[in-house]
């Protein structure tokens, strides 16, 4: 099972077990993973899990989406 680790400046803020196929990420409360930070768009990105692979799609967020960065 995939796992998403949310960190800031090397400090782990949250960990999520990714058991579903799709997760929305953003600042608004209707997202599966909510990040309450002004640099995160309301509907920021989408995580898609297919078999043993995970894909991250930016949803035209203002500040972009980065992996390991």
Residue ranges and their predicted role:
Residues 3-5, 12-69:
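Forkhead-associated
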């Amino acid at each position: 099972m995939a796992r998403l680790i949310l960190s800031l400046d090397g400090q782990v803020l949250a960990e999520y077990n990714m058991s579903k196929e799709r997760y929305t990420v953003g600042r608004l409360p209707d997202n599966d993973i909510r990040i309450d930070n002004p640099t995160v768009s309301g509907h920021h990105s989408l995580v898609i899990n297919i078999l043993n692979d995970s894909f991250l799609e930016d949803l035209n967020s203002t500040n972009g989406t980065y992996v390991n960065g």
